[in-house]
Amino acid sequence: MPNPVRFVYRVDLRSPEEIFEHGFSTLGDVRNFFEHILSTNFGRSYFISTSETPTAAIRFFGSWLREYVPEHPRRAYLYEIRADQHFYNARATGENLLDLMRQRQVVFDSGDREMAQMGIRALRTSFAYQREWFTDGPIAAANVRSAWLVDAVPVEPGHAHHPAGRVVETTRINEPEMHNPHYQELQTQANDQPWLPTPGIATPVHLSIPQAASVADVSEGTSASLSFACPDWSPPSSNGENPLDKCIAEKIDNYNLQSLPQYASSVKELEDTPVYLRGIKTQKTFMLQADPQNNNVFLVEVNPKQKSSFPQTIFFWDVYQRICLKDLTGAQISLSLTAFTTQYAGQLKVHLSVSAVNAVNQKWKMTPQDIAITQFRVSSELLGQTENGLFWNTKSGGSQHDLYVCPLKNPPSDLEELQIIVDECTTHAQFVTMRAASTFFVDVQLGWYWRGYYYTPQLSGWSYQMKTPDGQIFYDLKTSKIFFVQDNQNVFFLHNKLNKQTGYSWDWVEWLKHDMNEDKDENFKWYFSRDDLTIPSVEGLNFRHIRCYADNQQLKVIISGSRWGGWYSTYDKVESNVEDKILVKDGFDRF
């Protein structure tokens, strides 16, 4: 469950005078979560959407783009709102409803269960950028702390990719902050539990599911980036009844829910661009290169005005702030630039590792360093509030140079900061445009904990005494599969062997080679459950029950006897000498 937030944000066209006086009222009385996330009940919902960060709120607003028209400027307001117990996390609510659905505690009409699962998959992937917290009811004026004016400004074609090369618009936040005189400062926070259709649910409840989704934006908010990616709707979307007109998002795109796109068009609409970095003192220019088989990333010095003999390696910056290597081999996994600690305090070395949406050492910030927006500092989120950047060692020999992250204050004398240069000869402006994510893997760090010791699963199906390392076991939010990545990048998927036809109540699990995109075999699909979960009083540890889509079997491990450490699945809920509370990474569900 994501940490409950104290403040949330919403962009709204209504003025501060109106909101400060009356707050946000609901538009209807429909309390249907699936209709809410799929936007099929405009004007009828009892829920009100907010975002966890100003950036997420602005990105959602900014996705409603159109051609810039000076005669008709667009204005709105960004509101900061104090959250309370009526605010619920949308993704956690979706995950909990998936749990209840698999446990048969939510009932549906024929076909609705599959529709609901597809809606939750969209919430996990295409709409995850919204970082939504929604209210079950109106927001009082006393909860609204302040507001900022948000308006649209033109972006010249040279700094924004657009099929027609038009001048288009993006958004900005304007000072000053406007404070609400009716605001009440209280120590409240959002609800730490998921929303339920009926509080204290004890018997199965019925939820109706829409058969269509009205989606204003499936770009993951990429269109509101600094130089945004305007979705190219030419040719028109094959499954849209009313496709968007180029960049003018004044209409709604209506999708049949069965063909709701899992990727934004911006995944493939941007041109590929290599990444060039320049030393701020020596002015040497380097091309960013990669050796994916060895998880290595390095720099080669080039003359940007001459054609390089080195092959171009393509990276892109996605909505999870990852700098991802574009895969050209059809691999099952994706790789991203990852900052790792070294023996030197505060100095990190950059390698490639499997892309994970919850890996803080894969999150990078681009900060423009000049008015023309042609030079960007690249900083790692791993160092928190410490200002940092990318560096290379000026004393390193050879033609390939390692890439480091270091604090800007008092760096070692042999290190020089590198910054991304954006111009026609080097990095294209499209690189600093966030692209929609291509993968949605979560580093789960799967294992178990017993009497002060950590144990990790082995590909043999048994266990080994150690804490599962980062970057080894993942959960795919798109396919619901758990997979193990070896150092040589071989991928094995957790498979449930238990078959109801055998009549047995349990069987071992196994790790198999498998196609990530195969979608029919539910023995490869798993979900994380809180049902009947008793949390041990161990500080900082995160536990879940893990169940298989196929007949809801539960994943367990034997903790005594000759079969110690064996992983298996079972129909039995209560058993002795086993551990059913599976350890997952702290932060597994926070991203």
Curated annotation (Swiss-Prot):
A motif (KELED motif, involved in host ER trafficking, solvent exposed in the crystal structure) lies at residues 268-272. The N-terminus (up to about residue 249) has mART activity, as well as NADase activity. The C-terminal 41 residues are required for internalization by HeLa cells and for vacuolization. The C-terminus (residues 266-591) is required for interaction with annexin A2. Has 3 structural domains, the N-terminal mART domain (mono-ADP ribosyltransferase, residues 1-205), D2 (residues 273-439) and D3 (residues 440-591). mART is joined to D2 by a linker (residues 257-272) which has a disulfide bond. Disruption phenotype: Among 102 tested antibiotic-resistant transformants, none had a deleted gene. Changing residue 269 to A: No change in host intracellular trafficking. Disulfide bonds join 230-247. This is ADP-ribosylating toxin CARDS. Residues 273-439 are annotated as: D2 domain. It is found in: Cell membrane; Cytoplasm; Cell surface; Cell projection, Attachment organelle. In vitro ADP-ribosylation is enhanced by dithiotheritol. The gene is cards. It comes from Mycoplasma pneumoniae (strain ATCC 29342 / M129 / Subtype 1) (Mycoplasmoides pneumoniae). Induction: In strain S1 (grown in vitro in SP-4 broth), low expression, higher expression in the presence of mammalian cells. In vitro expressed at low levels in early- and mid-log phase, transcription decreases about 130-fold by stationary phase. In vitro protein levels peak between 24-48 hours then decrease by 60 hours, remaining constant until at least 144 hours (at protein level). GO terms for cellular component: attachment organelle; cell projection; cell surface; cytoplasm; extracellular region; host cell cytosol; host cell endoplasmic reticulum; plasma membrane.
